[in-house]
Regions:
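Short amphipathic alpha-helix that is part of the acyltransferase structural core
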Residues: 1-30, 122-125
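Small/polar loops that bind or transfer phosphate-bearing groups
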Residues: 8, 68, 102-103
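Conserved beta-hairpin
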Residues: 35-55
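A conserved beta-turn-beta hairpin within the catalytic core of GNAT-like acetyltransferases
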Residues: 59-67, 77
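Conserved acetyl-CoA pyrophosphate-binding loop and the N-cap/start of the following alpha-helix
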Residues: 76, 80-85
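Conserved active-site alpha-helix within GNAT-family acetyltransferase domains
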Residues: 95-128
Length: 128
C-alpha cells in the first residue's frame, strides 16, 4: 500500500534509490535527501519505507512557489501516484498566488489537469 508523508524523519538516504535515471548529472541519494530536507515543502510516496515518488516546492511561503522536481519510479508509474503527489503539493500551496514549474512539452497535459497553463519563461539548465 502506498502512503504519503512530508516528515523528513521518515526518509533516509538508503530509501532514496533509483531516481534521476538518464540524467547527465544525477543527484546522489545524499544530495537528494539534502534537497528534500531544504525544500519549503515536499511530499514523498512510500511503499513500506521505500520512497517510490516525490514532489518538492521552493517557496517564500507568501506569494510564489516553484516546483522543481516530481518523479515516480518507473515501476510505479501509471498508478495515480504522480497525480496524488501533485494534489497533495497543491493543497500545501493553496495560499500561494503564483505556482510555477518547468516541464517538457510531452507532459504538459498532466499539469493542465491541475489548472496549470502554458507560459513563456527563461532559465539556465546545466546538463542533467
Amino acid at each position: 500500500m502506498i502512503t504519503y508523508t512530508s516528515d523528513i524523519a521518515k526518509i533516509t538516504e538508503e530509501n532514496l534509490q533509483g531516481f534521476f535515471v538518464g540524467w547527465a548529472k544525477p543527484l546522489s541519494p545524499n544530495q537528494h535527501f539534502e534537497h528534500l530536507a531544504k525544500c519549503a515543502y515536499f511530499v514523498a510516496a512510500l511503499e513500506n519505507e521505500k520512497v517510490v515518488g516525490f514532489v518538492t516546492a521552493l517557496s517564500d511561503g507568501v506569494g510564489c512557489a516553484f516546483i522543481p522536481l516530481i518523479e515516480v519510479l518507473p515501476e510505479y508509474q501509471k498508478q495515480g501516484i504522480g497525480t496524488t503527489l501533485m494534489q497533495k503539493m497543491l493543497e500545501f500551496l493553496k495560499h500561494i498566488n503564483a505556482i510555477d514549474l518547468m516541464c517538457d512539452e510531452e507532459v504538459q497535459g498532466f499539469y493542465e489537469r491541475f489548472g496549470m497553463k502554458k507560459m513563456n519563461g527563461m532559465g539556465i539548465r546545466k546538463a542533467r
